[in-house]
Amino acid sequence: MTTNTVTLQTAHIVSLGDIEEAKASIKPFIRRTPLIKSMYLSQSITKGNVFLKLENMQFTGSFKFRGASNKINHLTDEQKEKGIIAASAGNHAQGVALTAKLLGIDATIVMPETAPQAKQQATKGYGTKVILKGKNFNETRLYMEELAKENGMTIVHPYDDKFVMAGQGTIGLEILDDIWNVNTVIVPVGGGGLIAGIATALKSFNPSIHIIGVQSENVHGMAESFYKRDLTEHRVDSTIADGCDVKVPGEQTYEVVKHLVDEFILVIEEEIEHAMKDLMQRAKIITEGAGALPTAAILSGKINNKWLEDKNVVALVSGGNVDLTRVSGVIEHGLNIADTSKGVVG
């Protein structure tokens, strides 16, 4: 593959070469996740060929492990010796914690005091020190930065980092390996590291691949920034897609997104719940809210059919770390509003 004029605009931030190097760097650690065809989304909804990229089957249950492992692999021996630190309420924390365990590095994770007990325990399970501090993520982040400065630890950012973006971009290379003639790729978006990496990989190969970002109506800082062409914050309420609950996107990720992403779709909370339920019922896939965003966009009918009908489409299921109580609630709500016993399965 060669870098084309489209991706040259953002090559100073992250390039195809960075992603190919990341692929080699993280290969011993990650799982190459499956890409499966959804008969339901293909035959009954889009009249296209819709495939699901199952990052919910990645180690730690999320794509975040890719970026975290690539970033940490590139630290100097001195940085590794002093230890690493991250602020996260969920998937990034587990990605950092597992990588640190595999490489024998001391890691500290600072979580908001409101972090779900299940995610606290999962992170501690990797032998990582977990500190609960702050009533919201901003307070948590500020405390984490203080600790890093005091102790000389290296911060592993969840998205606004070249090596993190490159690690996430390896998903794009895997998609191309499986479906070289993919037409449309639909990606959940929070801070933007995932879509920035994937867009770089895909557009380097074929600039005509249509890349769609999906966010919740409640929290869509990146979509707002994309259409205003200026870094902007947006959050009016919480979202079931908590993995994408990022008020202000990254500065570096935004620069990549504004050049390489084609459009954004916004979905409401009920549409995300419906997608989670349908993925469970039809495809037998358990996903968190963020992982259901691309499917929600397809089911909502908000994507122009020209990008779906007779096209090879990939919808990314970014993670599956969801509390069982939430799964139970989604199922119960779904059963109350629809008959889920009929229709195409898969």
UniProtKB/Swiss-Prot annotation:
Spell out the molecular function terms from Gene Ontology: L-serine ammonia-lyase activity; nucleotide binding; pyridoxal phosphate binding; threonine deaminase activity
Instruction: Identify residues that carry N6-(pyridoxal phosphate)lysine.
Output: 64
Has UniProt tagged this entry with the keyword Nucleotide-binding?
yes
- One Pfam family linked to the record: PALP
Instruction: Identify the EC number(s).
Output: 4.3.1.19
Keywords on record: Allosteric enzyme, Lyase, Nucleotide-binding, Pyridoxal phosphate
Keyword Nucleotide-binding (UniProt) = yes
Q: What class of enzyme is it?
A: lyase
Q: Which SUPFAM superfamilies does the annotation name?
A: Tryptophan synthase beta subunit-like PLP-dependent enzymes
Pathway participation: Amino-acid degradation; L-threonine degradation via propanoate pathway; propanoate from L-threonine: step 1/4
Recount the known activity regulation: Each protein molecule can bind up to four molecules of AMP, which act as an allosteric activator to the enzyme.
Q: Which reaction does it catalyse?
A: L-threonine = 2-oxobutanoate + NH4(+)
UniProt family annotation: Belongs to the serine/threonine dehydratase family.
**What is its biological role?**
Catalyzes the anaerobic formation of alpha-ketobutyrate and ammonia from threonine in a two-step reaction. The first step involved a dehydration of threonine and a production of enamine intermediates (aminocrotonate), which tautomerizes to its imine form (iminobutyrate). Both intermediates are unstable and short-lived. The second step is the nonenzymatic hydrolysis of the enamine/imine intermediates to form 2-ketobutyrate and free ammonia. In the low water environment of the cell, the second step is accelerated by RidA.
Subunit structure and binding partners? In the native structure, TdcB is in a dimeric form, whereas in the TdcB-AMP complex, it exists in a tetrameric form (dimer of dimers).
Protein name, please? L-threonine dehydratase catabolic TdcB
The gene it comes from is tdcB
